[in-house]
Regions:
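S-adenosylmethionine
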Residues: 1-401
């Protein structure tokens, strides 16, 4: 999504606050750090807010500006590029995106959006920012019009996603579900909190429920970080071995288990999930909540859509197959393996299940969950427009005994 060039590490230093434009100054600085330094939005913004003296109301406004502009960056670029005669430096590009987002996607009065955004750029750039944003304000896009009649040029631009994501989802979900799913993931994420205070999406909570582990069961969570599912399983009374391949992420599981008072029920192991160091048949349930493209949970990370590449999907699909193949021997006869991913792509869901049907015809698919889950071959899928949750796919198999 990057346009233009320029020095990295722009606008460093502690943020000085106190003027009416402070919120937009913080937002612009955050957008520059995300764009130029390739910083992660969910790390950059909280650190900057902590280093500011903004009010709670202004912090909420900055959060909406930064995450919203990041999500809708492609759409904002198209809105302003209609009226730009030349490429501009990164700070001006970021300010134009910021202004266009307020004009097109927020209920900010046009005069306020334009004047306050103009005020945060250097004096030499204020003329072009003012002129372009006024043109954007005067020429709103008709969402129902075609490309030749004042409408958006295409679906990917209107919804602000890379072409490949839209193309793949159209092929896998069809037009209506794709538009609804991508639109839902442009909305801010809903916070779901368990009764123990742990924040966990409802789709993830339902994966744990469908694992159906209870007191006396021995459960392996093969890709456990940050520990949401492992701790939920432990709360149900099971003994959990939580594995992760990276020591830092495994430490997150330990910290979360300790915070919830579950350290006695969750044993954390640093282990490569494709070569797990456990005895065959040693678990009643194995959960493979595999690394995936995350195309069902894009609302959680405003910049995720711009970071994932199409090439990564095939690499992740291969890893997912290796993880499931490594996990199957660990399930005792009569036990259950659950495979889950927060993606909507057939390559990471249906294709894997089809391979398992050929390689392991002995596996018995278990009953599908009810709505809002939808049938997905021998498994089920929840779309992100269903109930405010992430998109998720789930397959459950019993190992014959």
């Amino acid at each position: 999504m990057a346009k233009g060039g320029g020095p990295r590490n722009a606008r460093r230093g502690r943020l000085q606050v106190g003027s009416p434009t402070d919120a937009r100054r913080v937002a612009l600085d955050a957008l520059l750090r995300i764009e130029l330094d390739r910083g992660y939005a969910n790390l950059v913004l909280p650190a900057m807010l902590a280093d500011s003296a903004l009010s709670d109301r202004d912090r909420a406004f900055v959060t909406e500006l930064v995450y919203g502009t990041t999500r809708m960056g492609r759409a904002c670029d198209w809105l302003v590029d209609r009226f730009l005669l030349r490429e501009v430096e990164p700070e001006v590009r970021a300010a134009l995106r910021l202004g266009a987002y307020q004009l097109a996607f927020l209920r900010v009065p046009s005069h306020a959006a334009v004047s306050a955004t103009v005020a945060v750029v250097p004096p030499r750039s204020r003329g072009v920012v003012n002129a372009v944003l006024r043109r954007v304000s005067e020429h709103p896009v008709d969402p129902d019009a075609g490309p030749d009649s004042g409408g958006w040029p295409d679906l990917a631009t209107r919804l602000s996603y890379p072409d490949w994501i839209v193309r793949r989802l159209l092929a896998d979900l069809g037009h209506d579900d794709t538009v609804a799913a991508l639109g839902a993931m442009n909305e801010p994420a809903v916070v779901h909190e368990r009764d123990d205070g742990y924040v966990q999406d409802t789709a993830s909570q339902q994966v744990v429920e469908l694992l159906a582990a209870g007191p006396g069961d021995r459960v392996l969570d093969l890709c456990a970080a940050p520990g949401g599912k492992a701790t939920a399983v432990a709360r149900a009374g099971a003994t959990v071995v939580a594995a992760d391949s990276r020591r830092r992420r495994a430490r997150l599981v330990s910290e979360n288990a300790a915070r919830l008072g579950l350290e006695g029920s969750v044993a954390v192991v640093v282990a490569d999930g494709t070569r797990p160091p456990f005895a065959a048949g040693s678990f009643d349930h194995v959960l493979v909540d595999a690394p995936c493209s995350g195309l069902g949970s894009l609302r959680r990370r405003a910049d995720a859509r711009w970071r994932i590449s199409e090439d990564a999907v095939e690499r992740l699909a291969r890893l997912q197959r290796h993880l499931v193949e490594a996990a199957l021997p660990l399930v005792r006869p009569g036990g259950v393996l659950v495979y889950s991913v927060c993606t909507l792509l057939d390559a990471e869901t249906l294709a894997l299940d089809a391979d398992l049907a050929v390689a392991h015809p002995e596996l018995v698919p278990l009953d599908l969950p009810d709505e809002p889950w939808q049938p997905l071959g021998r498994g089920a899928r929840m779309l992100p427009q269903s109930d405010g949750s992430d998109g998720m796919a789930l397959f459950r198999y019993r190992v014959p005994g």
